Amino acid sequence: MHAVRYTQAFIPTLKEAPADAQVASHKLLVRAGFIRQLGAGIYDYLPLAKRSLTKIEAIVREEMNAIGGQEFFLPALHPAEIWKESGRWEVMGDNMFRLKDRKGGDYGLGMTHEEIFTAIARDELRSYRQLPQVWYQIQTKFRDEPRPKSGLLRVRQFTMKDAYSFDVDRAGLDKSYEDQRQAYEKIFTRCGLDFVAVQAHSGSMGGSESSEFMVRTDAGEDLVAACPRCRYAANTETATSRVAAEADGPGLAAPEKFPTPGVVTIEALEQAPHSVPARRQLKTLVYMADERPVIAVVRGDQELNEAKLQTATGAQVVRPAHAEEIPPLMGAHAGSLGAVRFTRARVVVDPSLADRKDMVTGANEDGFHLRGVDVRRDLLAHGATLAELRTVKAGEGCPRCDGALEVFKALEVGHIFKLGTKYSESMKATVLDAGGKQVPIVMGSYGIGVERILAAAIELHHDDNGIVFPMAIAPFHATVLTLGPEPELRKAAEEVVAALGKEGVEVLFDDRDERAGVKFKDADLLGIPIRVAVGKKGLAAGNVEWKLRRGGAVELVPLGEVARKAAEAVRAATT
């Protein structure tokens, strides 16, 4: 195997990280010469990054092929018409890069490829006998991120492995989904990631069920609620919990209005002279679900989770109502709102409030509130419905056992979806089943962010000196360097490099005319798993210095054994 010489390689290391780099992976990828920024959320991948990304793609490809996946390569440029068939041309909004051709035709740059793969299935699949099918690609995607940041964690151009399964029924989908789940676990394990699979919100993808694969790191932007006792885990967009029951008084026979001039926040109502604890207040929020008003009600000290509201309403898009949209509907401004006996829009109440009595809420009249509200009597009896709305908090009870939930930041590296017939119905992709009936194809969608795996691995595996790469995705397995300018050291190092190459070990040969300290620092920064140093004293005894990047002590290894030792280390870490 051919070694790469440092003097011929392009490895533009830096002593300092960019001032705008906040997370470890961003700092180290720039300092170690893996990436450079071209624009906001747009990066050049330099040779070291390309080597690691190619290895990640190879692992993904192997595991996809192992479950019967067939690789495609589809266009990144999509005509608008195909996205309009599924209804997502409008739903994607500003997140999609859009352009017109010279004839005025509308196009989008693909964020994902459900529509394109569904169109192929519609045009080519005719019978249940052709199913199941598992199709995938590793392709460039585009997303117009409003706030690109954190290096490779939030970008506008990225590489995704997106796979799609096509089955004749739900049972087939269940099997395809499980196959993908197991393949994902193998991929992330091989890439050196410590991950957890969690229940997740499907968002604009749609479908009945989805799971995210999360890496626990403070660099993540998602929040996961997990129980250390029973291993329940879910994104806070879907997580549920047990909350302690409140001992309410009997309340009043009917809600009673009282003046609250200038009181427009939960916190203000907690203060004297009213002194109403937040847990006894009903927080009433006005949202637009697919541009239709919906009223969400949670406890005063709880936060509404917009993803849960989207699930509860079945809407494609939810947003807070604008300030000017609220008074015509509610009769008051924000801060004085309530849902007591309200029937002008759909009202959704969090289940934790179902049996609450003697509550306080806005009176839908500026400067007034209502006390003595009985949720069941005054809201549910008038058409309000129950649905999970609140965001769970750390310390609340696990919904599956007696344990307490912890909540932590996490980074999503993969997401799998049971799409069902969402796309096949809207795009009329059907096959004949065994009974001769035309049925919509049952689909699944499965995505992995390739660059995110690289960044996540670095977030998990680094120290004060640099990257500590897992062997399977390191740009090189080993680096060989000399500890002096003497010709005999160079000659011995060349022999070591050649022996390593014969054993299939990928080598970066640091042949620079630099001090040993500089070479050691760069080796640590680059994170190459094995370091072999050839020095005058060791060579006189027939030895070289051996050190593992992951916390290993320096060992003396006989010159003739180092290649075998390295090959064994590589095999042990990659098989």
UniProtKB/Swiss-Prot annotation:
Secretion signal, residue range per the UniProt entry: none
The reaction(s) this protein catalyses: tRNA(Pro) + L-proline + ATP = L-prolyl-tRNA(Pro) + AMP + diphosphate
One Pfam family named in its UniProt record: tRNA_edit
The keyword Aminoacyl-tRNA synthetase appears for this protein: yes
CDD domains attached to this UniProt entry: ProRS-INS, ProRS_anticodon_short, ProRS_core_prok
GO BP annotations, alphabetical order: prolyl-tRNA aminoacylation
The name this protein goes by in its record: Proline--tRNA ligase 1
Superkingdom, taxonomy of origin: Bacteria
UniProt keyword annotations, A-Z: Aminoacyl-tRNA synthetase, ATP-binding, Cytoplasm, Ligase, Nucleotide-binding, Protein biosynthesis
Disulfide bonds: none
Subunit architecture: Homodimer.
Listed PANTHER family: MITOCHONDRIAL RIBOSOME PROTEIN L39/PROLYL-TRNA LIGASE FAMILY MEMBER, PROLINE--TRNA LIGASE
Recorded GO MF terms: aminoacyl-tRNA deacylase activity; ATP binding; proline-tRNA ligase activity
Family indicated by similarity: Belongs to the class-II aminoacyl-tRNA synthetase family. ProS type 1 subfamily.
Cellular localisation: Cytoplasm
Chief place where the protein resides: cytoplasm
Broad enzyme group: ligase
Gene name per UniProt: proS1
One GO CC term on file: cytosol
Recorded domain comment: Consists of three domains: the N-terminal catalytic domain, the editing domain and the C-terminal anticodon-binding domain.
InterPro entries: aa-tRNA-synt_IIb (IPR002314), aa-tRNA-synth_II (IPR006195), aa-tRNA-synth_II/BPL/LPL (IPR045864), Anticodon-bd (IPR004154), Anticodon-bd_dom_sf (IPR036621), Pro-tRNA-ligase_IIa (IPR002316), Pro-tRNA-synth_IIa_bac-type (IPR004500), Pro-tRNA-Synthase_IIa_type1 (IPR023717)
Keyword Lyase: no
EC id: 6.1.1.15
